[in-house]
Amino acid sequence: MKHSQTKPRLLIAMRSELPEGFFGSREWARLNAITDIIPGFPHMDFDTAEGAEALAEADILLAAWGTPSLTRERLSRAPRLKMLAYAASSVRMVAPAEFWETSDILVTTAASAMAVPVAEFTYAAIIMCGKDVFRLRDEHRAERGTGVFGSRRGKSLAHLGNHARKVGIVGASRIGRLVMEMLARGKFEIAVYDPFLSAEEAASLGARKTELDELLAWSDVVSLHAPILPETHHMIGARELALMADHAIFINTARGWLVDHEALLAEALSGRLRILIDTPEPEPLPTESPFYDLPNVVLTPHIAGALGNELRALSDLAITEIERFVAGLAPLHPVHKQDMERMA
């Protein structure tokens, strides 16, 4: 965007609780230095009189969770809009298929910033689940000091621990690649399944490329990082889970879309696998779901992604993209129509 005496007008549209987490004094100062923020933010409805007026005035849209979808009709009411800066990961909800058919608006994403906490959470989950920390904590709490600590280190627990463990990564996404980089620094063997990844690329990440069935049968730990695509729906079902070894660990910090949860529940009820689910299907699970109570299941409420002060990493990147746009510089992380075929 070329410099002018008039600052571009910025529309902030996201869930009402998010600005407090996204923006501190530093972030507001950066935005005010380069844009004219449209009052009344955060706007959550582009179809009210106030929301429609704000959309019509906007040159830049700073979006996140809860931003209304930019349908063809809404785009027709946004004649000035030149940039969508998304301060989260997947832009699919804000930029649906019709957006790409009718718009040449620049789209940027903070997916690379979001990938960091998810990868950190996943790596920590691999370590913690490897030592069965959550189940042993529950047993220790119930025993209240009456248990025998020596029994925790006996031969019967050979499946516990992280020495030379074999970890299978399903999906060489941003997050999957970061997890592999973290694992490669330790004493892990790594395999990866991704039809878009070459064997050479896998090797550069410290992993070997395999087919899905081989990965499932080989791995002590399986971690999902594939995108939501028609062909990935329930890619992990009863047949695939049956390939996994007894005591293997199954981790999903991606999306419930990838897993047949009826099949996963059957395996969970058998006690054969150790399971961590951050993103179930449906989300949230119904109150009566057995997943909540099974000792071999760790269920977390979609917290692998940016949480608390981690939101500032997302807004920092989104604001950086806006600063670059206003200065006429190329974006760091643009999203194009063809990217949507493989992105989460």
Residue ranges and their predicted role:
Residues K2-T108, G237:
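An N-terminal-biased, well-structured beta-alpha scaffold segment characteristic
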